[in-house]
Design a protein with these regions (language model features):
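Conserved, structured core segments of small domains
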Residues: 1-143
Length: 143
């Protein structure tokens, strides 16, 4: 099972505050553990929402709103994508994360859908999705 581990933004991350060297070292050590355990698929920190945009959908209409966005509790500051056996294992890993912002922090864990979760998808569509995923993984492996 794949899980997205979402580091929630706060006022400091939205202000663009940089982690200290000690915080960076602690996070690097944690990421190293994930890699050595063979569970890390991806992981990145994100710039503040002031460097982003939102696209709102209403039928065929698209509306773009540039950041920053006011509600920091709805924003994310970073993520990991992990391959694990269960939600319980994901929780155990997340409990070991160094505090990502050095103060009040929150991390959300969400299971990622697989093609098997979509009962209305035809076999042809599932096969096409697998081919696209294989192509994506091959490109990622090339660096």
């Amino acid at each position: 099972m794949r899980f997205m581990v979402i580091v929630k933004a706060n006022e400091n991350t939205e202000a663009g505050a940089q982690p200290t060297e000690a915080e960076l070292n602690a996070m690097a050590a944690f990421n190293e553990e994930l890699v050595k355990a063979g569970v890390l698929l991806a992981g990145e920190g994100l710039h503040p929402s002031s460097k982003g945009a939102r696209v709102y959908f209403s039928g065929d209409k698209r509306t773009v709103v540039d950041g920053p966005f006011a509600e920091t509790k709805e924003l994310i500051a970073g993520f990991w994508l992990l391959e694990l056996k269960s939600l319980e294992e994901a929780v155990e890993w997340v409990k070991r994360v160094p505090n990502p912002t050095g103060d009040e922090s929150q991390i959300e864990i969400r299971q990622v859908f697989t093609e098997d979760d979509f009962v209305n998808a035809s076999q042809e569509l599932k096969d096409r999705e697998r081919e696209l995923r294989a192509e994506q993984e091959a490109r990622a492996a090339q660096g």
